[in-house]
Structures are given as structure tokens and as C-alpha cells.
């Protein structure tokens, strides 16, 4: 691993960047303007930028969120969300689903042939986050998950992140619930980072922008070792691990 203080010499080796959003572009409260300017500069160098986020919501919702936070649209070419690639997983499970997450995330199911049912009627579980009427800690779900596990219901996790920092606060994410369900012996299915589907989708979108691109010409940027870095290594990409500020980075050499 090599510590970097400037992105220019490194980025010249690549044709494109897959960049994380939460923790790199913003922290849920404030935008990291230095990161936005760096991404704009990367595009000005003739490179393509695809934002990869474990948000459980569709791309269109993330675009609106970034606009509301006044993130310059010139800092990216395309966006791929965990929510979008998770929809394919949802189509692979039985129709009757028990949804765990805030009401705003139900947009994840729009247009799909799902029937939302109560816990006792469900044939599968879709999780985007924590319920609004339960304490937002994983332990509060153990009893429910033991009941669901006894029925061998598959658990689809739309946001694999375990925890995120929202300003000065730490917030548990759906990945923490998926981890608990798996620890109880349940079957968990995930399409977001660090798993292949989100990278495969991003690569297809990148090739629509640039034509044929070699993986060794794509750099992944993120602040999550277990999501961004692990996913990049699995997919065969070089990665930059963000530590604090955008320009203080460590390069993680590609592992084949």
C-alpha cells in the first residue's frame, strides 16, 4: 500500500473511476467540496466517473438527493445504486414479501409484482433499513429474526452497509440486520457492494459511455474497507481507500 497526497499522477493511469458517495462525496449532512472538485477534475482529464452507492433507493432518488445537497452534476457521468441492482434479486423470490425498512424506501418495490404482507404470511424478507416503530439497534430484531429463520425465509438486503456516519452521528444500516440474520443461520442475498452485481451493472454502464474498457483501467474509490475496497478487489479493480479527507488516500494494489 502507498500513501498519496495528490490524485493527478495516479489518475492518469486510468480511464474511469467508480466512486462511493456516502463518506466520500458527502456525510449525509455536508458535501465534501474538495471531493466534488476532484471528481470534476477527473472528468476534465477525459476520464469517466460512475458513482456507486449502497443506497437502497433507485438512481433517480439519489440524483434528487445530490441535487438537494447542491452536489455539482458535472462531477459524475452515471450513478448505480444497490437499490437498482437489488430489484433483480427481489424478482427471484416468492411474491409475498415482508418489508423491513422506512416507508420512504418502498419506492424500491415500485413496478415489481410483489405483495406486501405481514411477518406471518411472508415467503421472503426485503430489508432496506430499520423499521420506524422499533429501536434502531440490531439486537431489537433478534426475536423477530429467530421466528423468520425458523421458517427458512430468504433475506434480501438492499443496503449492505453496516454503519454510516451522518455528520457526527453513527447510524446502523440494513447490513447490520443482514449480518444478524446470517449469524442466526438465515440465508442472506445481497447485490450491493462488495458483491458482484453492482460492479457488473456499473461496468455495463461505463462501456455504454466509453466502449470497451479493461478492468485494469478502472479505479474504485471509497471509504469502506468491507464494501468499497473488498468489492473492488473481488471484481479485479485497483482501489483508493479514503481516510478522512479526499486527498489523504492509500492505494490498495489489485489482487487477482
Segments predicted by a language model, with ranges:
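Asp-based, Mg2+/Mn2+-dependent phosphohydrolase catalytic module
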Residues: 1-21, 26-47, 52-80, 84-256
Amino acid at each position: 500500500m502507498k500513501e498519496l497526497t495528490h490524485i493527478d499522477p495516479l489518475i492518469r493511469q486510468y480511464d474511469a473511476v467508480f466512486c462511493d458517495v456516502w463518506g466520500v462525496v458527502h456525510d449525509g449532512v455536508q458535501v465534501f467540496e474538495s471531493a466534488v472538485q476532484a471528481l470534476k477534475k477527473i472528468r476534465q482529464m477525459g476520464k469517466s466517473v460512475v458513482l456507486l452507492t449502497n443506497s437502497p433507493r433507485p438512481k433517480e432518488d439519489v440524483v434528487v438527493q445530490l441535487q438537494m445537497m447542491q452536489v455539482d452534476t458535472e462531477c459524475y457521468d452515471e450513478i448505480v445504486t444497490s437499490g437498482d441492482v437489488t430489484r433483480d434479486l427481489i424478482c427471484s423470490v416468492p411474491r409475498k414479501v415482508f418489508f423491513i425498512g422506512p416507508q420512504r424506501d418502498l419506492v424500491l418495490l415500485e413496478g415489481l409484482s410483489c405483495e406486501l404482507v405481514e411477518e406471518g404470511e411472508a415467503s421472503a424478507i426485503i430489508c432496506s433499513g430499520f423499521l420506524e416503530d422499533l429501536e434502531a439497534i440490531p439486537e431489537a430484531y433478534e426475536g423477530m429474526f429467530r421466528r423468520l429463520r425458523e421458517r427458512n425465509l430468504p433475506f434480501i438486503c438492499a443496503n449492505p452497509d453496516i454503519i454510516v456516519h451522518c455528520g457526527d452521528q453513527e447510524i446502523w444500516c440494513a447490513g447490520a440486520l443482514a449480518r444478524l440474520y446470517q449469524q442466526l443461520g438465515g440465508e442472506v442475498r445481497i447485490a450491493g457492494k462488495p458483491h458482484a452485481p453492482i460492479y457488473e451493472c456499473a461496468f455495463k454502464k461505463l462501456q455504454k459511455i466509453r466502449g470497451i474498457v479493461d478492468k485494469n483501467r478502472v479505479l474504485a474509490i471509497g471509504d469502506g474497507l468491507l464494501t468499497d475496497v473488498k468489492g473492488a478487489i473481488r471484481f479485479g479493480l485497483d482501489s483508493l481507500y479514503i481516510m478522512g479527507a479526499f486527498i489523504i488516500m492509500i492505494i490498495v494494489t489489485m489482487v487477482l
